[in-house]
Amino acid sequence: MNLAEGVQYISFLILAFLVIGAALGVVLLSNIVYSAFLLGGVFLSISGIYILLNADFVAAAQVLVYVGAVSVLILFAIMLVNKREDFSKIPGRWLRNVSTALVCTGIFALLSTMVLITPWQINETGPFVENTLVTIGKHFFSDYLLPFELASVLLLMAMVGAIILARRDLIPELSEENKTATALTLPERPRELTSASK
């Protein structure tokens, strides 16, 4: 995205404050539905930062995968489960709070050290790519063809496994003598449920 330097700097600051504010809302709000919506806001703000970095494909993938899939999945899970439980006191809670604070402080110190010691100068000699989608597509189908195909096979296996798990409740109970005869057949919906749905 070709913007003036001042506009790009201000846009980055606005998006960074949106990311930090929405992330704090995710972890501090008691209503989990509001937290899920703010998580979608975090993902949208991160995609805006990707657009400022001229990574249009990564920004589109961020919106499609995280906002369109993960946030909607979390909202559906919250609304379908809808189970309210009262908070109960956990023994040794102060020890957990202290250990959590120490871990968070260590991670913050590590990230701050990395930010301070990393050289952030931009190399101007590199070629500027106008359309990153074409370049990523060429790399997918030339240099990274095998990992791309393996990822598609893994996604297909996950989809088949999800379908089998979803249909497991509809498989009828089989007796011991019929198990050996129908071991290699695909599970089908019981006739009672099929006729009832019609």
Curated annotation (Swiss-Prot):
Key words, A-Z: Membrane, NAD, NADP, Plastoquinone, Quinone, Translocase, Transmembrane, Transmembrane helix
GO MF terms held by the record: NADH dehydrogenase (ubiquinone) activity; quinone binding
Reactions mediated catalytically: a plastoquinone + NADH + (n+1) H(+)(in) = a plastoquinol + NAD(+) + n H(+)(out); a plastoquinone + NADPH + (n+1) H(+)(in) = a plastoquinol + NADP(+) + n H(+)(out)
InterPro entries: NADH_UbQ/plastoQ_OxRdtase_su6, Nuo/plastoQ_OxRdtase_6_NuoJ
Record-listed E.C. numbers: 7.1.1.-
Membrane topology, as annotated: Multi-pass membrane protein
Keyword Transmembrane helix recorded: yes
Cellular compartment(s): Membrane
Transmembrane segments: 9-29, 32-52, 61-81, 100-120, 145-165
One CC-aspect GO term: membrane
Superkingdom of origin: Bacteria
Physiological role: NDH-1 shuttles electrons from NAD(P)H, via FMN and iron-sulfur (Fe-S) centers, to quinones in the respiratory chain. The immediate electron acceptor for the enzyme in this species is believed to be plastoquinone. Couples the redox reaction to proton translocation (for every two electrons transferred, four hydrogen ions are translocated across the cytoplasmic membrane), and thus conserves the redox energy in a proton gradient.
PANTHER family xref list: NADH-UBIQUINONE OXIDOREDUCTASE CHAIN 6 (PTHR33269:SF17)
Family: Belongs to the complex I subunit 6 family.
Protein name: NAD(P)H-quinone oxidoreductase chain 6
